Amino acid sequence: MSETYDLFRQGQEHLARGRAAQATVALEKAKRREPEKASIREALGIAYFRIQRFSEAEAEFREILELQPVDHYAHFALGRCLEKQGKRDEAVGHYRMASFFRPQSEDYRRALEAVEAA
């Protein structure tokens, strides 16, 4: 296995154990090696979000959408980052996109309804 994959798995393991700050260390190293890998950026975005580094999480999810514009989870996660930063109008658009690409998701629908009602 490659060192990049090992770093990615290490980051995922830290996330699974609730150690998001430690996950960022491994995932940042993995991202430097393979910056075009959406799975690495997603895990890093999740880690940043969990430690309330919302603008950094936002950047990761935006980059995923540059690579994969129809990624429903990236739209949802970006919406959450934007909402946490008080950018509700922009969050609505990403929640709508997430719901469009995955209409069966109750989580996406609830997030959209909540931000629209705020």
Label every PLM stretch briefly.
Residues A16-K29, I51-E63, Q85-M97:
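Structural signature of tandem alpha-helical TPR/SEL1-like repeats
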Residues T4, A38-S39, H72-Y73, E106-D107:
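Helix-start (N-cap) detector for alpha-helical repeat units in TPR-like alpha-solenoids
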Residues A59-K84:
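Mid-chain, well-packed structural core segment of small domains
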Residues M1-T4, V92-A118:
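Terminal, low-structured helical/coil segments at or just beyond the last alpha-helical repeat
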